[in-house]
């Protein structure tokens, strides 16, 4: 059985899998894998959040592809040129929610694996897929939970490719070898409620929040390094729960997010922020939520194999990057080396999200080339001086 990755992308888009629902997509994918001889485990965690781990042949090394089928809400349906879950192709572009992030990536690596098996590809080892419906939200019941299940079952992955949309301008221009970590702080500053005409009888907490945020924003956390941009902070909310104009509020709440590199740790950042807060006021409450840790997969032979596959299919020399948001690769890095590579991300999460049909076919070809050379490296790969070591002293990363 061979698969057309574009048709599979269309089918996956048709599932209204708004996070963390899969709306049948996980079962559908499992059916495809089973027809090609994969052993499939559909795993439910939390409130019936579905995940899939599919594996072909029980050998080593185990090359895994990972991704998600859940999507963010489509927003106002009237703003879409086509129904977000009714995929349409116009002028070579496939439209639909999840087209970029990341149902085309999932379809491409499924097609690459299944089609190689149909072509009687000979290799020593295993190929597998880890697919979740809880990446955009409730991540504790998605990839993270599957990896814990695998650990308990003594199921090992040796290398993983996450099919997130990493390309910026052209398919093949960017591989992610790491991601910054993300921590969100909530700060509540207390004061004393009162009438605006009698400020001497009140204590306005808004000024405390403003002072603290100014200090945080002007803090140089670090200067970045060879692999990462400097850590930075962005304020996301300020709320006093007050819709009147003559009342000094009794408390003020703010939230801010820090995207941090491998020069920092969540604990170290908490200590720093706490010191800033205490320099302004003693009447505050500070809490922190760490969603995903920073990670870096040191470039190696497998990175070279992906660079070579991209170059062969697209004639583009990809850059290695750690920019952008977080992903489930931050969980996978705890069990094996991981890189991310996929389609162009320009329209991810946007109205009229779309990808090039031609790029879906090219992405599938790149994944196939990578799988073939991962298991059966060409003489070029075997004899190649590590590509990364030759360029790391130059402009390696974006």
Swiss-Prot record:
Binding positions (Zn(2+) 2): 101, 136, 349
Residues binding Zn(2+) 1, per UniProt: 68, 101, 164
Cofactor binding notes: Binds 2 Zn(2+) or Co(2+) ions per subunit.
Top-rank taxon: Bacteria
Cofactor (UniProt): Zn(2+); Co(2+)
Active-site residues annotated for this sequence: 70, 135 (proton acceptor)
Pathway: Amino-acid biosynthesis; L-lysine biosynthesis via DAP pathway; LL-2,6-diaminopimelate from (S)-tetrahydrodipicolinate (succinylase route): step 3/3
Keyword Hydrolase part of the UniProt annotation: yes
Classification via HAMAP family: DapE
Protein name: Succinyl-diaminopimelate desuccinylase
């Amino acid at each position: 059985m061979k698969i057309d990755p574009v048709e599979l992308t269309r089918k996956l888009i048709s599932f209204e899998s708004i996070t963390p629902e899969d709306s049948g997509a996980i079962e559908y994918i499992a059916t495809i894998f089973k027809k090609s001889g994969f052993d499939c485990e559909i795993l439910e965690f939390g409130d019936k959040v579905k995940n899939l781990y599919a594996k072909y042949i029980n050998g080593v090394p185990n090359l895994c592809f990972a991704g998600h089928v859940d999507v963010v809400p489509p927003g106002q349906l009237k703003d879409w040129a086509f129904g977000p879950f009714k995929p349409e192709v116009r002028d070579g572009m496939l439209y639909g929610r999840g087209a970029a992030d990341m149902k085309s990536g999932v379809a491409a690596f499924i097609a690459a694996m299944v089609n190689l098996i149909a072509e009687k590809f000979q290799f020593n080892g295993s190929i597998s897929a880890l697919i979740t419906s809880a990446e955009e939200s409730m991540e504790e019941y998605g990839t993270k939970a599957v990896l814990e299940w695998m650990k308990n079952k003594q199921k090992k992955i040796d290398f993983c490719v996450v099919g997130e949309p990493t390309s910026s301008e052209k398919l093949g221009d960017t591989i992610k070898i790491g991601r910054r970590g993300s921590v969100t702080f909530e700060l509540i500053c207390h004061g004393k409620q009162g009438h605006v005409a009698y400020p001497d009888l009140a204590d306005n907490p808004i000024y405390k929040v403003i002072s603290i945020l100014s200090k945080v924003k002007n803090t140089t956390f670090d200067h970045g390094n060879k692999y990462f941009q400097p850590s930075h902070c962005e304020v996301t909310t300020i709320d006093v729960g007050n819709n009147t104009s003559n009342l000094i509020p009794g408390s003020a709440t703010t939230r801010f997010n820090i995207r941090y590199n491998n020069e920092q740790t969540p604990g170290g950042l908490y200590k720093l922020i706490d010191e800033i807060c205490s320099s302004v006021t003693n009447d505050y409450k500070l809490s922190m939520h760490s969603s995903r840790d920073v990670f870096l997969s040191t470039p190696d032979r497998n990175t070279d194999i992906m660079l070579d596959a991209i170059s062969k299919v697209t004639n583009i020399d990809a850059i290695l990057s750690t920019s952008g948001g977080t992903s489930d690769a931050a969980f996978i890095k705890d069990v094996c080396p991981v890189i991310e590579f996929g389609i162009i991300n320009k329209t991810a999460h946007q109205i009229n999200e779309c990808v090039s049909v031609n790029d879906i076919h090219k992405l599938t070809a790149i994944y196939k080339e990578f799988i073939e050379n991962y298991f059966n490296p060409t003489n070029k790969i075997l004899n190649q001086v590590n590509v990364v070591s030759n360029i790391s002293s130059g402009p390696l990363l974006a």
